Amino acid sequence: MATPRLTPEQIAQVSGLVAKYVATQCERSASRAIPLSVPQRALMGGFFSPLLIDETRLLVLQGEWVANPDFYPMLRSLGFNNLPDQSAMAAITFCDVVVSHGPFSNGLLFHELVHVEQYRQLGIPRFSGLYVRGFLNGGSYGAIPLEVNAYTLGGRFEQNPANRFSVEDEVRRWIAEGRLQVCRWN
């Protein structure tokens, strides 16, 4: 089934709801989250700025799952039947707090740190708007340009973790080139 078309006002409303959800989950999770471990910091150093590594916090849930947003029923009533299930995600990044449903693999941590960098450069409102528009345009989680960026950079990391590159520069380049934008819904 095709993704329902929303009006610009509805897109703005959903983007605002997503931004509020992200900010709330970040605040709710921050007190329980911990810094990256020494081995994680060593592995991710050279890809991410020292400041990003210092400020990011991780939370591995045990026996609990991240709940879907309260606004999902409203979206389902509009015809959305393929919304990402938060409890089925390996991890979810809420600005600078990464919440995982299990232990972090190196690849998963890298992917989520790319999202931390995206939030750092875009801010929560713009990240949320791009995420919503990306989902609407592509019709699925995997087609969201922010996810494509994270998976692309993660693939480079997993192919050769010894080949360091600046994620900050790569995200900045994708933003400058408009690769995180989507035409149909902007």
Feature map (PLM): residue ranges:
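Active-site metal-coordination segments of metallo-dependent hydrolases
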Residues: 30-38, 138-151
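Active-site recognition of the HExxH zinc-binding catalytic motif
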Residues: 44, 107-119
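An active-site-proximal "capping" alpha-helix that borders the catalytic cofactor pocket
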Residues: 43-48, 146-158
